[in-house]
Amino acid sequence: MSEPLKPRIDFEQPLQSLDEPVLKSAQAFDEQAAEKFYPAAPELDAEDEEGRVEGLVNAALKPKRSLWRKMVTAGMVILGASVIAQSVQWVNQAWQQQDWIALGATTAGGLIILAGVGSVVTEWRRLYHLRQRAEERDIARALLVSHGVGQGRVFCEKLARQAGLDQGHPALQRWQASLHETHNDREVVELYAKLVQPALDNQARAEISRYAAESALMIAVSPLALVDMAFIAWRNIRLINRIAALYGIELGYFSRIRLFRLVLLNIAFAGASELVREVGMDWLSQDLAARLSARAAQGIGAGLLTARLGIKAMELCRPLPWLEGDKPKLGDFRRQLMNQLKNTLPKKDKTAH
């Protein structure tokens, strides 16, 4: 038996129709736009953060243009021209009057002024090379995303000359043998970063390990805090000078102060989060105090500070940005320091007993 029909249902509001998706118009990419296109990678977020820090450091490197600076420069130029004109007049008068004492004093003063001007020019040139290294990293960063051809090889050969690598260097020969005419600028720079640049980076890493170990051992065995502070400061400055020399940067007085200040500035911008990320949580999971003395723990801290200064000095002196997996980590230096201290301190204890 069939079921009775249901009554009709009247809806007060009309049924809502589904919204059709709005499609964007087609967009065609030409060859010029395709060369500038590169896919986005989420793993590059950390590198973007470091790039912002690098931008802040580069801004600190570049001199600030201001009206007062221009006025002071113009005043110094006018004063220098006046001193030169007055010196010429004094020399002329002393020569005519045969005043040999005044002539000798004027000549000596002129030589001192020339020596001072030469020192200023030399310091400016060294500061310029330090600023130029930051510009070279920007150029390298642009070439690493470029699909062009021709500029990468010229740029890398310039870096090799600045580093003092001759044509017979094994790393440079391997790089030249690996090049092919089909390689673009990005591939050429990547090959240079993987084959040639490690020859300098390994030397810098060895210097950092040696200086960090010396600082850690000095703090661990020395009972005088003032001597420790002076020793650490002296060794850190020596380390920065050594790393700069390895990468072909000649430091003067002001450029050395500028580089040391930029290293500290870079560390301040990086913050403590990078230290925790690189060292890891094994500081909390392992009972360090049970295995090493308090002085040894202080030595490890001083050694890590030296290693951190060295790593930041490498970043500022390298002509190329870090590629993935190339940047040295504090955890590697920490393990080396702990092994050296564990092998050294027990020997000292045995000899004392």
Curated annotation (Swiss-Prot):
Intracellular or extracellular location(s): Cell inner membrane
Signal sequence segment: none
Keyword Membrane assigned: yes
GO cellular component: a single term: plasma membrane
The entry's keywords: Cell inner membrane, Cell membrane, Membrane, Transmembrane, Transmembrane helix
Membrane topology of the entry: Multi-pass membrane protein
Protein name per the record: UPF0283 membrane protein YPO2347/y1985/YP_2134
Organism of this sequence: Yersinia pestis
